[in-house]
């Protein structure tokens, strides 16, 4: 069966996001097949930084200024520095149409992104960001052109042939993702110790959450890789598609070596030929204590783990063990 090429690879059963702020999130995904932490981490990082869409200023027109090499009376920064500061304005904008926004201010004081008069669905995400500083009696008026796009677009590509004199193109940093780092650690799944754990830190400008950014990047990869699949998957037999109605809790089909018990407890269960949780819960405490090298400490450990699953020792399980237990375990593995 060709499906085994991908179906029998382990997939993460833990994908957790924690956010320390509006702009920063950490992803932990485990377990992954050996090497997949690096493969997925690198692919997601590159797509996150290059391919997500966002909004940015593409041009600015400053009253009384003809080109970016000018200076403005009463403004401490020259126009080149002002343009560099404009590049760092973080913007969220819905829709694909080009929009305008204006700022007008008199000195003394700083002109910040929060002073900009926005229209429609534009939101300034870093209102404290300083654009320029005015001296006493100075005045400035700027009009910004805002567009949606992806990646980085240099100012030259934002320069329209029919642009009016004084319209200064700006390098556009569209990507809402500012920084991505990741590392891969070893993790354990049952008794296997060499699976990968992917830990990724995502920093955005606030227009998208780290969790959504990863979801968008994964969807982009999914869409791009789909063109390389040159076959149709064989249809499963009808009896494989229908899930057999069980007479017991599907969690009993989980193997005891997936319970993350201590080595001593796990070895005792293995030596007593206890493979599934369904085998284990039918044992009484007295029977367990008669197992060689199995003491009260191991008993308490197992009771605590079972209790967390709503189970206990000494339970009766009808129709156990089922004839096709291995097939059932694979079929129900997503339910426990």
Swiss-Prot record:
GO BP term, pick one: DNA-templated transcription
Matches recorded under Gene3D superfamilies: 5' to 3' exonuclease, C-terminal subdomain, DNA-directed RNA polymerase, insert domain, RNA polymerase, RBP11-like subunit
Enzyme class, UniProt record, top EC level: transferase
GO molecular function, one term: DNA-directed RNA polymerase activity
Subunit field text: Homodimer. The RNAP catalytic core consists of 2 alpha, 1 beta, 1 beta' and 1 omega subunit. When a sigma factor is associated with the core the holoenzyme is formed, which can initiate transcription.
Gene Ontology cellular component annotations, sorted alphabetically: cytoplasm; DNA-directed RNA polymerase complex
Organismal lineage: Bacteria, Pseudomonadati, Pseudomonadota, Alphaproteobacteria, Hyphomicrobiales
Region (Alpha C-terminal domain (alpha-CTD)): 248-336
Family classification: Belongs to the RNA polymerase alpha chain family.
Keywords: DNA-directed RNA polymerase, Nucleotidyltransferase, Transcription, Transferase
Reaction equation(s) it catalyzes: RNA(n) + a ribonucleoside 5'-triphosphate = RNA(n+1) + diphosphate
Name of the protein in its database record: DNA-directed RNA polymerase subunit alpha
EC number: 2.7.7.6
Organism of derivation: Agrobacterium fabrum (strain C58 / ATCC 33970) (Agrobacterium tumefaciens (strain C58))
Record carries keyword Cytoplasm: no
């Amino acid at each position: 069966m060709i499906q085994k090429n991908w179906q029998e690879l382990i997939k993460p059963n833990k994908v957790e996001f924690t956010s320390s702020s509006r702009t920063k999130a950490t992803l932990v995904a485990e377990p992954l097949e050996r090497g997949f932490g690096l493969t997925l981490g690198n692919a997601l990082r590159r797509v996150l930084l290059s391919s997500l869409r966002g909004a940015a200023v593409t041009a600015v027109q400053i009253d009384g200024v003809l080109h970016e090499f000018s200076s403005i009376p009463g403004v401490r920064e020259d126009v080149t520095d002002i343009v560099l500061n404009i590049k760092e304005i973080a913007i969220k904008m819905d829709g694909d149409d080009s929009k305008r926004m204006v700022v007008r201010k008199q000195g003394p004081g700083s002109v910040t992104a929060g002073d900009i008069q926005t229209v429609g669905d534009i939101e300034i995400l870093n209102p404290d960001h300083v654009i320029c500083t005015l001296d006493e009696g100075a005045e400035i008026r700027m009009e910004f052109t805002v567009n949606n796009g992806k990646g980085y677009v240099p100012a030259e590509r934002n320069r329209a042939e029919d642009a009016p004199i004084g319209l200064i193109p700006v390098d556009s940093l569209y990507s809402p993702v500012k920084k991505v780092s990741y590392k891969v650690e070893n993790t354990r799944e049952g008794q296997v110790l060499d699976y990968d754990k992917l830990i990724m830190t995502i920093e955005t400008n606030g227009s998208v959450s780290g969790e959504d950014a990863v979801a968008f990047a994964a969807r982009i990869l999914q869409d791009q890789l789909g063109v390389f699949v040159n076959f149709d998957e064989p249809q499963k037999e009808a009896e494989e598609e229908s899930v057999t109605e069980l007479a017991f809790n599907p969690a009993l089909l989980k193997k005891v070596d997936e319970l993350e018990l201590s080595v001593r407890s796990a070895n005792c269960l293995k030596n007593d030929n206890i493979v599934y949780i369904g085998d284990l819960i039918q044992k009484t405490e007295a029977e367990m204590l008669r197992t060689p090298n199995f003491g009260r400490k191991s008993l308490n450990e197992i009771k605590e783990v079972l209790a967390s699953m709503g189970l206990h020792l000494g339970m009766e399980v009808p129709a156990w063990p089922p004839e096709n237990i291995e097939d059932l375990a694979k079929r129900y593995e997503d339910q426990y």
